[in-house]
A protein has these predicted regions:
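Active-site region of the double-stranded beta-helix
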Residues: 65, 91, 96-97, 106-117, ...
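Non-heme Fe(II)/2-oxoglutarate
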Residues: 23-24, 173-260
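Double-stranded beta-helix
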Residues: 113-179
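Short, conserved beta-strand element in jelly-roll/cupin
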Residues: 88, 95-113, 161-164, 169, ...
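A generic structural micro-feature
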Residues: 96-100, 151, 182-186
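Short, surface-exposed loop/helix-turn segments at secondary-structure junctions
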Residues: 89, 144-154, 185-186, 204-211
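Short, solvent-exposed loop/turn segments at secondary-structure junctions
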Residues: 1-3, 75-77, 92, 111-113, ...
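Non-heme Fe(II)-dependent double-stranded beta-helix
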Residues: 1-96
Length: 260
């Protein structure tokens, strides 16, 4: 994607998330209202990002023509921040089967080894689902500090540097993480969780997802609406409903609370 497009999205991100946070300040019991989760339900820029043809073409090569967005997370690591993400597998906390979820990580600012870009351990997806443990630490960007329990050869990690507008794809079972941001600029990117329509949530809660290509042949999820304007009443209601379902599902499947 052109760098100028990424710059436009970044400016819109800063404008709209600031407006949302001002309108809906964090309150006890409203943890699920964060604009950092599923912003594509609230903002036009994010709705455009998750439907970008270049990203969808690459995802389709991996999962087929019927594609849903299951979740997104805004990963904002401030300059000089000690925040980091430990080695983990996404499949541990998404509550999906089969393990065919693919994450597209779209950079809106330079994502480099210095700024704490995503680093993967190639081939680890072949090991299947590994056990994880909680390591509470305020610097960890996952809410419970989820870390793979197995011994990891960090020296084998391969960083994935991205310039604004570039994206990477990683498998739901590949071990990955990211280091603190030692650069002078914020590292900002959107992690988009794409799944083939045949995937389903393994818990009892009926969740929602967004159809971005093909058909919803299996009806495993209620389909989410596309926002017609930033933070209009329908968009805010759809976002609250979707995140509320996810929150309720996480109460029944505690591992899902790591996504919040």
């Amino acid at each position: 994607m052109p760098a100028v497009q990424a710059e436009h999205w970044r400016r819109e991100l800063e404008r709209t998330t600031g407006a949302f946070d001002a309108a809906f300040p964090k309150q006890p019991g409203r943890r699920y209202a964060s604009s950092r989760m599923k912003p594509y339900l609230l903002f036009r820029w994010a709705a455009e990002m998750v439907r970008n043809p270049a990203v969808l073409d690459a995802v389709e090569d991996l999962v087929g023509p019927d594609i849903l967005v299951y979740h997104t997370t805004l990963w904002w690591k401030p300059a000089g921040s000690e925040a980091f993400v430990p080695w983990h597998q996404d499949g541990t906390y998404f509550g999906l089967a089969p393990h065919e979820h693919v994450t597209a990580w779209v950079a809106l600012t330079p994502s480099t080894p210095e700024s704490g870009c995503v680093t993967i351990l190639p081939g680890t997806q072949r090991q299947g689902q590994l056990p994880h443990v909680d390591k509470p630490d305020p610097a960890i960007m996952l809410s419970r500090g989820q870390t793979v329990a197995a011994e990891v050869d960090a020296a084998a990690g391969v960083p994935i540097p991205l310039q604004p507008g570039e994206f990477s794809l990683h498998d739901t079972l590949v071990l990955h993480g990211s280091a603190p941001n030692r650069s002078a600029h914020d590292r900002i990117g959107l992690g988009i969780s794409y799944i083939p329509a045949r995937c389903y949530h393994t818990g009892p809660t009926r969740l929602s997802a967004t159809l971005v290509r093909g058909e919803n042949r299996y009806d495993h999820f209620d389909l989410e609406p596309e926002p017609q304007a930033d933070m209009d009443a329908a968009a805010v209601a759809a976002h609250l409903d979707s995140i509320g379902r996810f929150w309720r599902a996480s109460e029944l499947m505690p591992e899902m609370s790591l996504v919040h």
